[in-house]
Swiss-Prot record:
Residues linked to a glycan: N258, N289
Binding site for heme: C436
Family assignment from sequence similarity: Belongs to the cytochrome P450 family.
Single GO term (MF): heme binding
Compartment(s): Membrane
Organism per entry: Aspergillus parasiticus (strain ATCC 56775 / NRRL 5862 / SRRC 143 / SU-1)
This protein's name: Averantin hydroxylase
């Protein structure tokens, strides 16, 4: 300091020098000295995270990563300390190692009440949550809940019959209504009434707004600028996030007031269990888990059904074949239930191919390599690196699939020209101990809704509203797909 308390000229000069030299020095380090220097990728992305963050906020990240993998190969450095993989050999070490690679907190949705749910919990809490919720999502549990699921799907078909005469319907919206009502019944013992009232519940809009806000929240969290978000963030998105938290809290509190009365929902088993040596689920834990369950249990199934319908409509020979098989197997609508639909020939292949081309969660969550480091897909990755297998990009890569952009359900037979397809890379529900607990529920919903829809109706894309539209390609991705309306003409079949 100078005699008057101000910094001396030397200190000022040092500050200027550091300010000027630090960015280029950091860039040189990350390009030429950093442990990830040997991995290919765009230089700007390797130097700083700005391009990644901007791409993510704009909803372009998945397609930008697809372009980068086409340019640089199966492993790409997409940030100073992050690698992206698309080879199936990467899945096992990243997602099934024991001890596990912990989730990257900067890739997780922040939790509003300070308590992580099943999607973000550490290993111990995740294992406990999963054990408490396991029965409700098991085959046995779903058999108990079958009547709730089938009731909502029957109402969907009834409402489609009543409304299809008015003109084309937005099936993406109707699928959202159906799966949201189903998860309302399963999660809280009470439907949200979307199908009954033929309108969107406010919670759906708040969920979708909250998902779009997550990349922005994580960008601010990464640089510890959370407080600035209230000043700079979209008021609409922030309000939707607040409303999403409030909806969840209100539903859980309402359920806890009737905790002693069985309601046929997932909380019956949770509230009834007395864990040996472990505490039961707290109110805050129930709120965080309910939020995750409602999102994962409604939005993802509706997304796949929308994508599957689009792909079938764009590939009429496959639509005709599946429709014929469904109608030849079932003489009466009453024969269609959650058990019988699993026996429809070719149905599973159609769903798997739809999941490959249009995975509801295009990016799997990133993990952090333990400090000791690890070999992933034949290469050494130092500890502390964020790693992930990009589901959408991997499934659209010609290195994994023959004719990767075409809808070809027959590829799942693994024969002929598709014998060398690396089908194991398609893991839309993830793998390992943190795979999707609702996988069985999703398949039950998807099979039952699709079979009933095609049994009752002939489908035709509304060319007036969908003319020259590549419905799938035009969607942005903010963790989940930003689905556009899917206008379809439904004609009740001539039985």
């Amino acid at each position: 300091m100078g005699g008057d308390g101000w910094p001396s000229d030397g200190h000022i000069l040092l500050l200027i020098v550091l300010t000027v030299l630090t960015p280029p020095s950091l860039a040189l380090y990350r390009l030429w000295i950093h442990p990830l220097r040997s991995y290919p990728g765009p230089r700007w992305w390797a130097i700083w995270r700005g391009p990644y963050i901007l791409s993510n906020i704009r909803g372009n990240l998945v397609r930008d990563l697809q372009r980068l993998h086409q340019q640089f190969g199966p492993v790409v450095r997409i940030a100073p300390n992050e690698l992206s993989f698309i080879v199936p050999e990467a899945a096992s070490p990243i997602y099934t190692s024991n001890p596990e690679f912990p989730k990257d907190p900067m890739h997780l949705p922040p939790f509003h009440n300070g308590t992580p749910g099943i999607l973000a919990a550490d290993h111990a809490h995740h294992r406990r949550y999963r054990r408490l919720l396991a029965f409700s999502f098991s085959d046995k549990g779903l058999r108990h809940e079958r009547s709730l699921i089938e009731r909502s799907i029957d109402l969907l078909i009834t409402q489609l019959h009543e409304n299809c005469g008015q003109g084309p319907l937005d099936l993406a919206l109707w699928f959202n209504w159906a799966t949201f009502d189903i998860i309302g019944d399963l999660a809280f013992g009470d439907s949200f009434g979307c199908l009954e009232n033929v309108q969107t519940h406010p919670w759906i809009a708040s969920i979708q707004g909250n998902v779009k806000l997550i990349p922005i929240l994580n960008a601010f969290r990464r640089y510890r600028l959370d407080g600035l978000l209230r000043l700079l963030g979209s008021r609409k998105l922030l309000e939707q996030r607040r409303r999403n938290a409030q909806f969840t809290t209100d539903q859980v509190d309402r359920r806890l007031k009737n905790s002693s009365t069985p309601r046929g929902d997932i909380w019956d088993a949770v509230l009834a269990q007395k864990p040996d040596g472990e505490p039961p689920m707290t109110r805050d834990e129930m709120i965080s888990n309910a939020s995750a369950i409602v999102l994962a249990g409604s939005e993802t199934s509706a997304t796949l059904l929308s994508g599957c319908t689009w792909l079938l409509l764009k590939n009429p020979s496959h639509l005709h074949q599946l429709t014929s098989r469904i109608r030849s197997q079932f003489t009466h609508a009453s024969e269609i239930d959650s058990q019988s639909v699993s026996r429809v020939e070719g149905l599973q292949a159609v769903l798997e191919e739809s999941l490959r081309l249009y995975p509801p969660v295009p990016m799997q969550s990133n993990r952090i390599v333990p400090q000791a480091g690890a070999y992933i897909a034949g290469g050494w990755v130092p500890g502390g690196t964020s790693v992930g297998l990009q589901q959408f990009v991997a499934c659209r890569s010609s290195s994994n699939f023959h004719r990767p952009d075409e809808f070809l359900p027959e590829r799942w037979q693994g024969q002929g020209e598709f014998a060398h397809d690396r089908r194991e890379v398609s893991q839309p529900f993830s793998i390992g101990p943190r795979n999707c607990i609702g996988r069985q529920l999703a398949y039950v919903e998807m099979r039952l809704i699709l079979v009933k829809l095609l049994w009752h109706f002939d489908l035709r894309l509304d060319t007036t509203r969908m003319k020259d539209t590549d419905w799938l390609a035009e969607q942005g991705i903010w963790i989940l797909w930003d689905k556009k309306p899917l206008w379809v003409t439904l004609e009740p079949r001539n039985e």
